[in-house]
């Protein structure tokens, strides 16, 4: 695992043109035995089961988000996933027809930095976002929990 931290600054007085228009979160506790940190031991996971699960859930979440914006220009949609495994991310992007240039990631530079991964990618690209853009975040993480979010960039003012 890499080392990373992220922070969000929120304001009730300064308006923003960037806002989340959709967010869902869920988990699959019945698969508890696939990712385990025993009381007296080390992190252990069933790699094949977890990888397959991550690909399916990331792809499903991404497709769910894209279904919310069917008329959006595909050149204005960007994808960010959990930064644990570049192969998982690339597979999900390909299955959802996201062009490589629209798949943002940094796992190749920093490794798996846990829950700071996706926010750090968003932070790296924040100033590139323009009105009419969308960022689809589909994240699968520890505890076999997943979330999908749609960040919409509206016109200024």
Each model region followed by its residue ranges:
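Short loop/turn motifs at secondary-structure junctions
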Residues: 19, 72-75, 131
């Amino acid at each position: 695992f890499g080392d990373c931290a992220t922070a969000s600054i929120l304001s009730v007085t300064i308006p923003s043109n960037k806002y989340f228009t959709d967010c869902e979160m869920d988990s699959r506790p019945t698969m508890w035995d696939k990712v385990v940190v025993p009381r007296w031991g080390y992190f252990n996971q069933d790699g094949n089961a977890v990888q397959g699960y991550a690909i399916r859930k990331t792809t499903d979440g991404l497709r769910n988000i894209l279904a919310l914006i069917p008329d959006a220009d595909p050149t204005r949609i960007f994808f960010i996933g959990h930064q644990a495994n570049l192969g998982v991310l690339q597979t999900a992007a390909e299955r959802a027809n996201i062009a490589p240039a629209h798949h943002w990631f940094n796992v190749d530079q920093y490794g798996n930095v846990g829950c700071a991964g996706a926010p750090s990618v968003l932070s790296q690209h924040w100033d590139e976002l323009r009105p009419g853009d969308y960022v689809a975040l589909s994240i699968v993480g520890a505890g076999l929990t997943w979330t999908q979010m749609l960040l919409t960039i509206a016109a200024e003012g």
